[in-house]
């Protein structure tokens, strides 16, 4: 090669190889060693699979005192999450049956060949974890994270654990023995697509099934509680419940008695899943208890709650204490403190899962049966009427005191058609929103007091009234069997119905005025009616006439039932009052 001529890359590599042949030899040896180590590692891992498979089954059987099956288990060499070389382990088809006896023996009797099949306590579609190659003999092997997928936990009813036959005694491992040659320390468990099924022995009930989209366990140690975070899928209303807390320790003798405590958050749940109501619900709270029995304290907020048939939105907030029966999902509420608009409502009762069979099918859920006792003290009647009215303006305003039963059975009809109530109420300081109706009430009051001229005055004071009655609500109709409507100068006893849809009125009754008929009319016409006063006096009233109210609350029709008037007779001066005043059916909490 001539002086000054440069070598190409290929020539430089050949020259370097001729000058340093030992480097190529060393690299070749390392490559061969790496291949040999990898092959040896793979062979060792494959040979260790049956041993580790058996040890895992034995360790789980010892911990759960139960029969354990594992379909497949494989190990391989590879990098971990932090780049550490180690062993990847994967398993499929893990099943753990309920414990054979309450305590003592970890290997149970085989499942009976006769009778119904026994569901596994735990079924797992797949799991995987990574174990680093670094290991110190005096320290446990640390597994940073275990991945689970397709976990099903099926807890039998409590009665199952009270009648379990003892397993045969023999050469079995002691409880608490892991069955593994070395100790293992776990970091976290991350699981996707889990289902918790809580069995029940109650007739006519189905197990409660809880879908868990994801959960994570941390702080795992034998016979101790662990921390968890979870996302639960709520079926109705559809939404995700975020929860975190402490679970455990796991009760081997009866897993359903394993303690649990935590907080939850449920956001933006669409109440439109339920036929007849609408709104976006959010809820937060905390719970404590066991998997079978939980005490829950929480609050809900639905700023746009409405009955879809009517469409008027109301702000609805609640605070509640609930006792949840985990075996069937039934919930006892004691109490619920709700605020609808400006009205405070106290409720106690239960929400029960309802089941039915249709056309010979198996038992299936048809919704919930809500059965409550409610009480209202110094609430506002317009809050209730606004919710159950097509118009933004309610029928009337005033203070309400109420005691009633409240029930919504399961069904496909809208809520306002399924809802039923039965109780008693007292309304005070009541005014009708319709000017036409309120004017008629005020005219009735002034004439009943014998002040007909004041009734015509545009500057007269507003007249408030009171109402009280027993009542029933069914299929969207309010039935009032003994409505007592009182204003100054008049007392009206009515019975009839009011239809929520359309506001149809249908009432009949008797109006009793303090003034005589002549004083009610006044003027020269009153003088002409003076001889007729004695025909309208009855039971201490200056005037008593049968009346009816029809039409709608917007356009009511008031009338006198003339057919009932001939039955009246002149009241003699010595005639005593024969009818006693109606007893109050719902005295107000406070008088004004």
How would you name each of these model-derived features?
Residues 471-479, 484-493, 501:
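Extended serine/threonine-enriched, polar tracts that run as long, contiguous segments within proteins
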